[in-house]
Curated annotation (Swiss-Prot):
The keyword Cell cycle does not apply. It comes from Oncorhynchus mykiss. Plasma serum. This is Salmocidin-3. Its main location: secreted. GO terms for biological process: defense response to bacterium.
Length: 16
């Protein structure tokens, strides 16, 4: 759930 920046990919509102 929360907006997380995974390395170079921004996952907004995603748990991935």
């Amino acid at each position: 759930x929360x907006p997380q920046q995974l390395g170079h990919v921004k996952a907004a509102x995603s748990d991935y």
